[in-house]
Amino acid sequence: XHPDLFXXRPDNTASPKFEDPRLNP
């Protein structure tokens, strides 16, 4: 998870720049 930073993109298309799995699995 993560906040919807792209406007509706699912988690698997969110950029690691904003969604680092080490920080927010």
Curated annotation (Swiss-Prot):
Q: EC number(s) per UniProt?
A: 3.2.2.22
Name the source's superkingdom: Eukaryota
Which transformation does this protein catalyse, written as a reaction? Endohydrolysis of the N-glycosidic bond at one specific adenosine on the 28S rRNA
Which keywords annotate this record? Hydrolase, Protein synthesis inhibitor, Toxin
Named from the GO MF annotations, one term is: rRNA N-glycosylase activity
Which top class of enzyme applies to this chain?
hydrolase
Provide the GO biological process annotations.
Answer: negative regulation of translation
Q: Which intervals of the chain are annotated as region Disordered?
A: 1-25
Q: Does the keyword Amino-acid biosynthesis apply?
A: no
Q: What does this protein do?
A: Inhibits protein synthesis but does not possess ribonuclease activity. Also inhibits HIV-1 reverse transcriptase, beta-glucosidase and beta-glucuronidase.
The similarity comment for this entry is:
Belongs to the ribosome-inactivating protein family.
What is the recorded name of this protein?
Answer: Ribosome-inactivating protein velutin
Q: What is the organism of origin for this protein?
A: Flammulina velutipes (Agaricus velutipes)
